């Protein structure tokens, strides 16, 4: 985690810091304070202490270990079978990147059609504001028109400044109230804001992701991308677990196209830049100065009145000032026409990219939904022209990035672990045996996740890695005890059996301590799967 160069590594770096600090402190206590406390509490007795490992429990444990050793092939077969079941069980677990948070907050986003004015967006935002203010589960809320909320917590997906966009951050009285309010808001948005693309959702955790299900269609021609995007959207829409499937380009909208006749423009001393500035100033306005009002500076904008820019005829009659001081109508140097075009074109690595996005219904995991949809896009992928491709985005892609960032630092960490094991064990065979025990943690991981119906996400993956380290630590303790007994002249069979008996209590106690430490985290939405 410490070497991961990704937003996920940044988000979860605290795990590395806390675990490292805890292990260092526990090591200091183990080699310093624990022996001192032991010599202080465990006084010598006349006649000596009784044999600790000769109780009824230890006799039964010794017999069980003896049986496993005598039937070693059966024991190995059972272990391999349990491991295979664990691998199969991992395939049956729900997949997750990061869960929704347990904050009593709801985010509402509203998109009017591209080209809608700030005033139109504000009117719709005020309509929703009046509805939210009457909701019995809402404690407070704030709305933003033209842009999104400031990034008040790390997982918030930032929005661009757009006049057709509005966002609400709604704080409810409690988490159950949040769940009730989000259902009501979704119904209200569907029924009363039918002409607007709107969504209400719980605040997420993890690196910012715009939508839980995303598929990117990439290629050179925007028209072909639009057609392919419609096909992909239809496949996504057919999945019963998706909501509000749409493309980020929006619907085609009318636009005015002005084509300048370069010969005529040059003949009267006009350039394309001069025409563009004049038309832009008349239609959109141009800042010609500032006005100071107390501690604020207000722009003074010069713009043609609405009657001179309301239609194609008025735009064609706009007067353009030439270098000679004469004014000519725009229609004299340009052809003005109305066309339908894409309101916004997104690019990724300079390639036109259309993203099909969708929300998911409650109770399902976004990576599972994406995994259900992706194979059904095989027919579309097979028919793609050259230079076109379809990629998976959203949490699935972010999860893959996070795993790659961790895998990039894995060789260095594996080398460090191998070096430490070789220093401790002094033999390749013992080191290999210790390493082979680490994957056995999947047996418990799969069983626990399926039993408690927890998803396997990024944090759970970190927990599985930590569990593998704990298993190797216990194996090192046992192997070291066996080696000490062998060096003392104990027969190999007896050394293995008695070492397992003697190290049983400390290994179980350390495991039990770890389990008890995880209990407070077991109900947390983020750390619960790891616990």
Report the location of each language-model feature.
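Short, hydrophobic beta-strand segments
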Residues: 86-88, 104-114, 155-174, 204-223, ...
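Hydrophobic transmembrane alpha-helices and their membrane-interface caps
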Residues: 3, 21, 416-503, 508-527
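Solvent-exposed, membrane-proximal periplasmic/extracellular interface segments of envelope transport
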Residues: 119-208, 263-285
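Transmembrane helices with small-residue packing motifs
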Residues: 2-11, 80-116, 152, 197, ...
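Interfacial helix-loop-helix hairpins and adjacent transmembrane helices
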Residues: 3, 7-13, 32-80, 114-120, ...
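Signature of alpha-helical transmembrane segments and their immediate interfacial
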Residues: 50-99, 138-139, 143, 215, ...
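Transmembrane alpha-helices and their membrane-interface boundaries in multi-pass membrane transporters
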Residues: 1-3, 10-49, 168, 440, ...
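Extracytoplasmic/periplasmic membrane-proximal domains and adjacent transmembrane bundles
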Residues: 226, 233-413, 419-425, 431, ...
């Amino acid at each position: 985690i410490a070497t991961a160069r990704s937003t996920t590594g940044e988000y979860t770096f605290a795990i590395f810091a806390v675990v490292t600090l805890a292990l260092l402190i526990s090591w200091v206590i183990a080699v310093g304070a624990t022996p001192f406390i032991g010599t202080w509490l465990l006084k010598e007795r006349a006649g000596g202490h009784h044999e600790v490992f000769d109780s009824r429990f230890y006799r039964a444990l010794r017999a069980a270990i003896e049986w496993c050793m005598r039937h070693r092939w059966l024991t190995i077969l059972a272990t391999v079978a349990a491991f295979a079941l664990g691998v199969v069980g991992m395939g049956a677990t729900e997949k997750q990147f990061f869960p929704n948070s347990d904050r009593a907050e709801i985010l509402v986003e509203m998109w009017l059609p591209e080209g809608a004015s700030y005033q139109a967006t504000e009117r719709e935002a005020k309509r929703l504001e009046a509805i939210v203010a009457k909701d019995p589960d809402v404690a407070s809320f704030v709305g933003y028109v033209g842009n999104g909320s400031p990034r008040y917590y790390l997982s918030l997906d930032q929005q661009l400044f757009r006049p057709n966009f509005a966002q609400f951050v709604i704080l409810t009285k409690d988490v159950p109230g949040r769940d009730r309010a989000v259902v009501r808001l979704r119904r209200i948005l569907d029924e009363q804001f039918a002409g607007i693309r709107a969504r209400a959702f719980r605040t997420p955790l993890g690196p910012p992701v715009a939508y839980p299900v995303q598929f990117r269609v990439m290629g050179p021609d925007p028209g072909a991308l639009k057609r392919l995007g419609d096909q992909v959207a239809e496949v996504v829409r057919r999945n019963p677990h998706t909501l509000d499937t749409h493309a980020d380009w929006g619907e085609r909208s009318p636009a005015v196209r002005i084509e300048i006749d370069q010969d005529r423009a040059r003949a009267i001393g006009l350039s394309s830049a001069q025409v563009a500035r004049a038309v832009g100033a008349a239609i959109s306005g141009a800042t010609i100065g500032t006005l100071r009002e107390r501690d604020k500076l207000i722009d003074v904008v010069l713009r043609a009145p609405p009657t001179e820019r309301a239609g194609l005829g008025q735009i064609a009659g706009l007067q353009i000032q030439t270098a000679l001081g004469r004014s000519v109508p725009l229609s004299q140097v340009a052809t003005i026409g109305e066309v339908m075009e894409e309101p916004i074109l997104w690019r990724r690595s300079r390639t036109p990219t259309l993203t099909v996005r969708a929300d998911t219904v409650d109770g399902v995991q976004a990576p599972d939904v994406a995994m259900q949809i992706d194979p059904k896009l095989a027919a579309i992928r097979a028919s793609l022209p050259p230079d076109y491709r379809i990629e998976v985005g959203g949490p699935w892609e972010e999860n893959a990035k996070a795993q790659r960032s961790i895998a990039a630092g894995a060789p260095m960490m594996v080398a460090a672990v191998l070096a430490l094991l070789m220093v401790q064990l002094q033999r390749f065979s013992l080191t290999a045996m210790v390493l082979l025990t680490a994957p056995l943690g999947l047996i418990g991981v799969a069983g626990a996740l399926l039993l408690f119906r927890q998803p396997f996400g990024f944090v759970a993956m970190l927990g599985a890695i930590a569990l593998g380290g704990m298993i190797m630590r216990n194996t090192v303790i046992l192997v070291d005890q066996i080696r000490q007994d062998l060096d003392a002249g104990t027969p190999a069979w007896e050394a293995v059996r008695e070492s397992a008996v003697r190290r049983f209590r400390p290994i179980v106690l350390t495991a039990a301590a770890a389990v008890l430490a995880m209990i407070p985290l077991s109900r947390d939405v983020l750390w619960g799967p790891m616990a």
